[in-house]
Amino acid sequence: MEGMALYLVAALLIGFPGSSHGALYTLITPGVLRTDTEEQILVEAHGDSVPKQAVISIHDFPRRQKTLFQTRVDMNPAGGMLVTPTIKIPAKELNKESRQNQYVVVKVSGLPLELEKVVLLSYQSGFVFIQTDKGIYTPGSPVRYRVFSMDYNMHRMDKTVIVEFQTPEGVVVSSNPVNPSSVLIRPYNLPELVSFGTWKAVAKYEHSPEESYTAYFDVREYVLPSFEVRLQPSDKFLYIDGNKNFHVSITARYLYGKKVEGVAFVLFGVKIDDAKKSIPDSLTRIPIIDGDGEAILKRDTLRSRFQNLNELVGHTLYASVTVMTESGSDMVVTEQSGIHIVTSPYQIYFTKTPKYFKPGMPYELTVYVTNPDGSPAANVPVVSEAIRSEGTTLSDGTAKLILNTPLNTQSLPITVRTNHRDLPSERQATKSMTATAYQTQGGSGNYLHVAITSAEIKAGDNLPVNFNVRGNANSLNQIKYFTYLILTKGKIFKVGRQPKGEGQNLVTMNLRITPDLIPAFRFVAYYQVGNNEIVADSVWVDVKDTCMGTLVVKGASSRDNRIQKPGAAMKIKLEGDPGARVGLVAVDKAVYVLNDKYKISQAKIWDTIEKSDFGCTAGGGQNNLGVFEDAGLALTTSTNLNTKQRSVATCPQPTNRRRRSSVLLLDSKANKAAQFQDQNLRKCCEDGMHENPMGYTCEKRAKYIQEGDACKAAFLECCRYIKGIRDENQRESELFLARSDFEDELFGEDNIISRSDFPESWLWLTEDLKEPPNSQGISSKTLSFYLRDSITTWEVLAVSIAPTKGICVAEPYEITVMKDFFIDLRVPYSVVKNEQVEIRAVLYNYADEDIYVRVELLYNPAFCSASTEGQRYRVQVPVKALSSWAVPFVIVPLEQGLHDVEVKASVRGELASDGVRKKLKVVPEGERKNIVTVIELDPSVKGVDGTQEQTVIANKLDDKVPETEIETKISVLGDPVAQIIENSIDGSKLNHLIITPSGCGEQNMITMTPSVIATYYLDATGQWENLGVDRRTEAVKQIMKGYAQQMVYKKADHSYAAFPNRASSSWLTAYVVKVFAMAAKIVKDIKHEIICGGVKWLILNRQQPDGVFKENAPVIHGEMLGGTKGAEPEVSLTAFILTALLESRSVCNEHINILDSSINKAIDYLLKKYEKLQRPYTTALTAYALAAAERLNDDRVLMAASTGRDRWEEHNARTHNIEGTSYALLALLKMKKFAEAGPVVKWLIDQKYYGGTYGQTQATVMVFQALAEYEIQIPTHKDLNLDISINLPEREVPLRYSINYGNALVARTAETKLNEDFTVSASGDGKATMTILTVYNAQLREDANVCNKFHLDVSVENAQLNSKQAKGAKDTLRLKICTRYLGEVDSTMTIIDVSMLTGFLADAEDLTRLSKGVDRYISKFEIDNNMVQKGTVVIYLDKVSHSEVECLHFKIHKHFEVGFIQPGSVKVYSYYNLDEQCTKFYHPDKGTGLLNKICHGNICRCAEESCSLLNQQKKIDLQLRIQKACAPNVDYVYKTKLLQIEEKDGNDIYVMDVLEVIKGGTDRNPQAKARQYVSQRKCQEALNLKLNNDYLIWGLSSDLWPRKNDISYLITKNTWIERWPNEDECQDEEFQNLCDDFAQLSNTLTIFGCPT
């Protein structure tokens, strides 16, 4: 019998011939094949001269069930028996949903030997890029974008692209399909409620979303600057051993090219890790003259801050520079960072050097030398030691050194050092590596060295390529030619042969460099020796990055290249490739001052494209196969030379390495400190001489010192010394103030047309170059347009995509726009309603003569300003030639929203004039608060009858600022069911299961089963790469061997037994059916007759009328039965055989008519028994059989039999438990109970069971079958199909969203201004999350902040006259914060969070002194000087005393004018317990004169008039009062008495008793109790209301503020208030007429009402 088995095996394996020794057949493909892309492969027959037709076919892996592509090619001697067929793999035929790597089989037949190679697959079929019009945006603005798409041949591809916009938190807020050819791509509009930070626009192909391209842009609030500042350090590093000072040149230019006059404030510092340590003594004021200045960091200054400079090595120096214009109207802050502090100024890398060398042949060592900041270091001499070779780096930092290697060595130690003449030897940079010898095949000693020595290679060059060979003479004489492949962008671009003559050891060929080879290519060459050896080498070649085609933007004529006037007409000319599509945009260069990181460039395009190279080294390889692998190729030959299987498409990415005290006081300090020789004591002395912001005495300061008595003594001595000098200076100090202004009358300016169109980007056009090309093959097109109104330089950026020449980014074309006289109106991003602010109109005169200018601020009722409806505000100022003058205007915004600020100016005696109108954003008062509500939508759990309905209750906003909007944003996101466990069992652990079957009919199945189930599992999970894709072929061979051997034990009736003469076994026959049915899914050669014959035998011979199956001949190897051999045997056997019948159903249904009836009888039997079963194992097995037959959907009985709902256990039976639990998992998957399946999978994986053979057969089969089914079903389980309806109160039609698996992560958003209840309903399957964000402005409430565990006092006062004032500051105050912890011990790690007054910044120097020195009061501090909103200071304290009050003082400087300042706040809290906190507010008292200092002309009175004024005018008569009281919208007229004045929440509350209702209004019963009249505190003086006085008062209906059961009255500018004399005063002659008028007014309106 065994002889018969071997014969059958031999017959089945006859299709596997042995190797032919007559020729060497080779197949080479790219290491990764891309779908839907034409790819070139190579098939070669070396040593064969017989013409052949080869069949190239591509099949799916691992099952090879589909032929994805097939072609035939003729191989003949005329073509060198070499063919390069083109293949294309259609993505639609493959499973793109798989999370695993996918492979295809490339097969070559028609040769004497078939060639096969399994190759990794990629679905990325091209490149896609996004261009946004800018790199930075403000909330609410549109983001314009366009898409460029091309294939790997750089051909334009108008394939649909999905564009997603993602917030900084990664939430997808928009996802839309876009056709790159469309010129009407709708911009994405940023919402007003938007996340600040870096956003992403992500583009990916619709049918291959795993690869994407991302464009970034920032979103924040900003105002464009009027000039840019560039910093240029003298060196890119700070050499620690040097003695030179460090210089930084400062260049400041207006955006229209003129030079800035002003001042720069420069502060140097060192960044140590992530902490910035400034050098306070380096703070200097540098004049900017003619746009230039220079800052110097002296070595002594650096040493004064850091005594041991060697400790700074490895850290970086930075220079922070603030440049302010002469007029003070604009300020730009910039920083030069990343200046490395080094002992050696260079670093050496071997990033472009091959790791392998050929002994006895030249070795090209490419070294890359960088500056410490990672930039290339040019002109640096380098030298290699041992094998000496010298060179000098080029502009890209590289130098090539040729090393002549010795013959007999296997490793080559290499050390390269810089050889700079100005550096001592110990400071030269060095780098070492060891190159390894190339291993020849079989130790033959045959080598090939490909050399390309040109330094810089560009398109159009003819490149000499040298082929050097070395080996024994016999081998070399066999070489007739070299075969070479050129790869670029991951594709085989060209294949060729270079002949070699006999005796030639060096062959040179010329290679023409075409644009297709940009940005780099790989040159791979090999030759064959005999018919079994391949000798190979490769080299990576960089090509200069340029456009493959042409694109130029220029002025259409010489006139267009000149400086232009705003609004002028001009033309530009485009020159490019015929048929190219050109995208244009003009961007204000001020945008790039704020952010130029994200601008599209040709370099970025090539950087992305270069990543498509599948090669991962600089060339060469460990051996012949390594050469192909490292170049990104896959190779197989007829002699079983095979490259390793690739498992990732990309290469590992290397780290990217690119890119005022007086002089006398200072002298006194220096002299005093010099008296201490000890460095530590000198530090104590210096700290003692630093000014203490809190004003502590020297003695109190000394209490904080912990460095010992000697330090304390030095500190006290120096502290007292400097105090004496300061006191003397104080007595001599004086303060001088000066002011002048004038008025003049000039002509009107109504004819001046104001400039108002100031876009940040425009000219967003797409143009096709359809014009006939010229003699150079270039098409051109002229565009006409009108310039916008900005005085700036526009940068016109053009990006083209040509039909066959890829993407080209043109050099930007600049258009400078200016005129000799103009206004620059500097408007902040936003101002707060009712906060008085100063804006500046800067007048620029670039003429050669002085001028006099009249400036006019136009009236706008939305502001209170010096311009009124009846009289415009004008001022005349002189402006010197080639200079500027700032005219300040103070305004009070009275209404929210966007409002025009317009300024006009005309030059006296000339026609020159200008006008500017800009929008000013006015935001509401109060503190912006967010309320977030999250609702989970899960209708299957939370719904009734499948629908979840929920009412969202409106938020209670009792603290909302009146007359402000509420913004509510509703966002819905689906919750896709994620896969619980990926790669449940590691495929690499299954090697032991692929074994050779053997033995009797039972043993053969025991040993065949592991190969079947391992292959089944690895196919399902896509894990062959973990085990080795070549092992699948071996596994299939073992399966077929087991199949052939089992035929020996098949009886004529298709039943099976251990031996042919033994009675047939029901269980064994069913098991053979089950395993063969599984194997039929793996290989095609298992015949259906074999499977179905066993099924028919079971039905006809072993099934009883009631459906049960009987066993008449149990198996010999009882261990192979698994758990079925226990109790409840009939149910177990019937369920087991039923599963086998169901497995075979797809194969046998057409061949066995009674199969369905047999299955139904077994089902009926099992259904009767199911609920009564006792064993967990039998319950699980039966549940699986019934669920597989689709007759069980209820999992309650199954789960009741489990232990912990994740396993089905019986005592002391591990493998049976694994088997039974696997059946249960299969049952749950068949019932679609995916949530319940998760814990079961986790339990199975935790068992770390990798299967076996004897005694473990059923556990092995079932665990891998179950986990494979889990892997198959979970990715396709997309049980998310929700319909959501949101009924918002202001919408007639509900918002309806449909959420499924494909769009789950795209947020659906809606916004409403109402704060009302609304309903949401959800139905369907799955979950979603609805987030409701409500944003509103809350009143500042001091009493709402109850202090817990902290006492806190906050106050502000005027700074002392001798206090140092920050440069550019308009005023200086001192902030005093005193706190004490109210616990039993000191509070550790306490934080003080200070919200600054608007317009004020904290004094960093004061805070630095508090945090430095031996008498350290604070641990550290952080300043956020955000001028758009209020700045903040966060102070960290190591402790706060519980026994005494501790105070901090520091100065705050006013940098811009703000009137009616909102209160600032100070919060102290414990880091470890946030409930322990206290908040207090602070505000400068008007008595300090702060308000008066911002007055300009009569603006102060106007600012006060924004409140209601107490009407004391004598010219008011009865008729005027009646007219005003009866005006439209006047709601009420009362006579009141003022009972009480309260201060609350920053407002004044006037409590009034309504004595008489003269005209009734909204308030139904105003006399029921006293009424509250609310006024802003700023209006107190203007109103001047007195207690117990009577008043005539009326107001508008819009000024009523409904409360819970009451009404408050707002006092606004529309409120009429007059004092009503009392009865005694009415007797005086002075008040008689007034009292009569009031009485008559009351009678008229009460009796007759208002006249109609």
Curated annotation (Swiss-Prot):
Residues 661-739 are annotated as: C3a-like domain. First processed by the removal of 4 Arg residues by furin-type protease, forming two chains, alpha and gamma/beta precursor, linked by a disulfide bond. This mature AVF is composed of three chains: alpha, gamma and beta. Mg(2+) binds at residues 519, 542-543, 545. Residues 992-1270 are annotated as: C3d-like domain. One of its GO terms (molecular function) is metal ion binding. Belongs to the venom complement C3 homolog family. Interestingly, a peptide (from position 1111 to position 1125) coming from the pre-pro-protein has been identified by MS/MS, suggesting a longer gamma-chain in AVF-1 than in CVF. Heterotrimer of alpha, beta and gamma chains; disulfide-linked. Is active with factor B in the presence of factor D. PANTHER family: COMPLEMENT C3, MACROGLOBULIN / COMPLEMENT. This is A.superbus venom factor 1. It comes from Austrelaps superbus.
